[in-house]
Structures are given as structure tokens and as C-alpha cells.
């Protein structure tokens, strides 16, 4: 299957499916229906079947989906056997939380290093991860580091993103409120926690369950 032809909305749901299939496999379950998947991941059955259809016949009508087959398929599709090495930039409260968490439920993603300008943090380890001065950014980001997490103050986010264009980084997960302009070689995902919270509150008030 040509990955370019898969809708981005479908691609964003694949890790969600994979996480649930992993849990099913660990529990010893052998097969699962689209209805069970729907209930667990809160995506309607029709959408799940359509998502899966982009990859061919993953299941059988009346039987559902073989859990081990799905696990193997999604592991390969999501490159779960390849390690994604990550750098975190900005070791404030949120950044520190990321360093302690370090994707403990995702064995193929690992924060390898962090950067900050606070002399009390530079040269130390947080969660077992070394913290370097931001001045060392270009020197430290080698070809092994593909993704950067930005948890810096909004007023310096663009400057940091500009510098990342000259490193091995090809993806940025931006947790700042700033909307960044990046080079074509970099894909950026914005996660504004304040906006997400405001959206949730709006839905709670206007679309009560």
C-alpha cells in the first residue's frame, strides 16, 4: 500500500489502534471485532473498517480480526522495530515531566538528550537524560536524532525552530502557543494545551452527553 494515499486522519488513528491491539495481545485475546475496537478506542465501527480497508483484507466477515496478525501488521506499518530518537528543548515544568516519562509505554521512542539555558540544569541528568546548553544544539543533534519536542517559552520558539532546520531533525512536536514557520524538510505538529482545554470546555457546555 502506498503510504501517500492513506488519508492523514486515518494515519493519525493507526497508533491508537496499535496500542489497543497490543493490550489485547498481552491479555491473550485471539480475535476482535470492529465493534469491540470501536468501543475501546471511541471510533465508530464504519470508520475503523474504512481505515483498515486501505491496507487490504485485514479481517474476515463474521470472524473479525486476528489479534496477532493485526499486531504484526501495525508493528511493521508503524515501524515499531525502528527506534525513533528524540531531543527535548526546554526543560521547564512540562519538559521535565516529559523527561521523567520518556515514553515508557512506547518502546520504540526515546528521548536521548535535552537542551536548556538554565545553568542549574545544564550538565545534569533528569530522568537519566543529559541536559546540554542550548548553545550546543547544532553540535549535539546528529543524524540519530530525527524528532524534537519544543517546550520552550513561546517568544523563543521560532528562533529554536530556525536553528533546527540546520540539524538532522525532520519532525517537531510543538507544545508552545507559537505558530511556527519551518523549512519544507520539517513536518510540525502543534499541540496547544490551552486551546485543547478551551475546546473541551466548549463541548462540555454546548454538547452535553
From Swiss-Prot:
InterPro entries named among the record's database cross-references: CoA-bd (IPR003781), NAD(P)-bd_dom_sf (IPR036291), Rex_DNA-bd_C_dom (IPR009718), Tscrpt_rep_Rex (IPR022876), WH-like_DNA-bd_sf (IPR036388), WH_DNA-bd_sf (IPR036390)
Top-level division of the source organism's lineage: Bacteria
Record-listed NAD(+) binding positions: 90-95
One Gene Ontology cellular component: cytoplasm
Gene Ontology MF term list: DNA binding; DNA-binding transcription factor activity
Keywords carried by this UniProt record: Cytoplasm, DNA-binding, NAD, Repressor, Transcription, Transcription regulation
Annotated localization: Cytoplasm
Regions recorded as binding DNA: 16-55
Gene Ontology terms: biological process: negative regulation of DNA-templated transcription; response to redox state
Role description: Modulates transcription in response to changes in cellular NADH/NAD(+) redox state.
Similarity annotation: Belongs to the transcriptional regulatory Rex family.
Subunit field text: Homodimer.
Protein name: Redox-sensing transcriptional repressor Rex
Lineage: Bacteria, Bacillati, Bacillota, Bacilli, Bacillales
Name of encoding gene: rex
Amino acid at each position: 500500500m502506498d503510504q501517500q494515499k492513506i488519508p492523514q486522519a486515518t494515519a493519525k488513528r493507526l497508533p491508537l489502534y496499535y496500542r489497543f491491539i497490543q493490550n489485547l495481545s498481552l491479555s491473550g485475546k485471539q480475535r476482535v471485532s470492529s465493534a469491540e475496537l470501536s468501543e475501546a478506542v471511541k471510533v465508530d465501527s464504519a470508520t475503523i473498517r474504512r481505515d483498515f480497508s486501505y491496507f487490504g483484507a485485514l479481517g474476515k466477515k463474521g470472524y473479525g480480526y486476528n489479534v496477532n496478525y493485526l499486531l504484526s501488521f501495525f508493528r511493521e506499518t508503524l515501524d515499531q522495530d525502528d527506534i525513533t530518537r528524540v531531543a527535548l528543548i526546554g526543560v521547564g515544568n512540562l519538559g521535565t515531566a516529559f523527561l521523567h516519562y520518556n515514553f515508557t509505554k512506547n518502546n520504540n521512542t526515546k528521548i536521548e538528550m535535552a537542551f536548556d539555558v538554565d545553568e542549574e540544569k545544564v550538565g545534569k541528568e533528569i530522568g537519566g537524560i543529559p541536559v546540554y546548553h542550548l548553545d550546543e544544539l547544532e553540535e549535539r543533534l546528529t543524524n540519530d536524532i530525527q524528532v524534537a519536542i519544543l517546550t520552550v517559552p513561546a517568544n523563543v520558539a521560532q528562533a529554536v525552530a530556525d536553528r533546527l532546520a540546520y540539524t538532522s531533525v525532520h519532525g517537531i512536536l510543538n507544545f508552545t502557543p507559537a505558530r511556527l514557520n519551518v523549512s519544507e524538510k520539517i513536518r510540525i505538529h502543534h499541540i496547544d494545551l490551552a486551546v485543547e482545554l478551551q475546546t473541551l470546555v466548549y463541548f462540555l457546555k454546548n454538547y452535553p452527553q
